Amino acid sequence: MVESNQAARAKFDRLLRPRSIALVGASATPGSFGESVLANLKNAGFGGELHLVNPKRPVIQGQACLGSIEELPSGVDCAVLAVPGAAVVASIRACASKGVGSAIVFSAGFAETGKEGAAAQNELTGIAEEHGMILDGPNCLGIVNYMDGIPLTFVVTPPQPKAGIAGAAILSQSGALAAVVGVNMRHYSIPLTYSISTGNEAVCGVEDFLEHLIGDGVTRVFALVVEQFRQPKRFMELAHRARRAGQFLVLLHPGRSKAARESAATHTGAIAGDYDAMHTLVTHAGVIHVESMEELVDVTQILVRSHQLPRAGSAIFTESGAFKALALDLCDRVDLNLPALSPQAERALREALPAFIPPSNPLDLTAQGLVDPDLYRRTLPAVLDEDRFGSVVLCIILTDPKTTRLKLPPIVDAISALQPRKPVLFAALDEGAPFDFPELEQLRALGVACFPSPERAMRALARVTSFALGGDNRDSNPIVSQELQNLRAGLLSEYESKQILTQMGIAIPQGRLVSNADEGVRVAKEIGFPVVLKAQSANLPHKSDAGGVILGIHSESELLQGWTGLHCSVQNAHPGLALDGVLVERMGAKGLELIVGGRNDPQWGPVLLIGSGGVLAEAIKDVRLLPPDLTRAAIEQELNQLRCGALLRGFRGSPALDIGAVADVVLRVGRLMRSMPEITEIEINPLVVYENGSGAAALDALISVAEHT
């Protein structure tokens, strides 16, 4: 909605950092919105102008009230509307006429309820846009500016110390989850800069607030709860911008299941997009996508506290031999790499440990920490100094408070003395044990993220490590041939589709489109038997099902016989269908069959698909979704992640296949999709890949083109 410029920034500041506030619907009734907002502002010591509006009460809590919005002075920065939904539109109109710069609307009953509510919300949008007013909501819990102590919400908000330069901002469409996530973050002493509940986003959405806060100098992590993306492509652009600014985006996006997407649409009044496409593209844009509120808090905690990202595997220290085995299973499950000790690290640990503790990763220190206070200071450098370790997790038993008070101070002393730059995490093995020891707060102050369980710690660490190792792997060349700029709209035939692939440099079998059997014989003799015949029509996408494909033709007589049979089969399946012709192609050599596809998601844009291909593609479902702008090297890595990746690399004596040629095809399909948004779908199935150095060929292909607008 709002462009990123100085004027826009000033507008948003009137909402996020108001110097004057009008509380419309101020109240003395305990628990009411108007009373709760007023209590928050007084408890926070808000020092700006505060105007109370209540036509029925001349005084509230010793402060005089105005009888109406019309009595406000002109140019108030922000109006907080604690009024019923039926009064909201008139209140916003009155605020606009008084030059109020921004407003927060708590009331529900707008677009999330149906046509009438949507019409009322559209009226709100029109008034705000006409008068240049910034508006948060409706159907939201408001905004808390922790940096300046301005809680514009009815949720009880205790003041907190300023976050400094490494805080987290909560941006959530859901007001309830904004409040819950905030409580959970404060429980783990995560410093907060802002908590913003956007609700129905009639005027300002998550993207607007995100754009305003990128580069703010105080927010290191954006913890996002987004039920529906209204501007997906803009969101991805902002994600790239935030990453360049050294800020991190952690996203919780409900909607993996169909039922969840429908529920979210009902809740927010927006249309659900494709979840898998979203995950693929936002991850590529540099967003850490999590699956639960716990993960949202846990990943945020690591990013806020760590001096640097974990760019390698992890070392685990524990006090239990049994947990050592459990840790190996857990790390395998969450895909957290546990490198073996190097000879140097093993030697250093042998020197630091008593003889009965063998060096390993995970390292079982037994109960030695109780009798050897210097143990952690001696052992931690062995892994912190190794490049193969990007992080350390201390898994400590807290069951017995007496022994815990003996163990924790030496750990604090070790971290304080070593001042590690790499992330060090603390995880209690016993989630039911007390978790309020003062030493844990000391560890947090030293940059150690503390967790109530190893699973939460390691799952979050795996997310952050995967993100850190991702890097920028975007292909920067989207340009394709100008000859492709005028494509026919609709579903293209295989022959037409292959002509486009040829212009993109993708290999296809030798062949030609013919209109009669004699011409077919001439072409077959030119390219050499064996050949294949394929019926061609945009109205016949599944030609094999209609008998429109004849394979393995080795002679002129077989071709003539096949020609007749093909036409009879197609007419039986689709009476009256006129073919564009028959494609005569040289029979492709056998190889591994893959599928390479792409589709233009209406919300997110192009996304690619790779996987096992051929007639069993849908049954096997060995596929991966990719962004359309990966580099060749990144595509090869993705191909190796497929179940058929072992066949590409060479399996049980079979030769390695030309994975580089497949990556080239995927790269070119991605460039085509990015350059030509009118292409809605591409499918190459099968793409046959041959031995290394022998390339890959598209044996069948279909392209769909949108109607020109």
What is the meaning of each model-derived region?
Residues M1-T709:
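Catalytic-core regions of core metabolic enzymes
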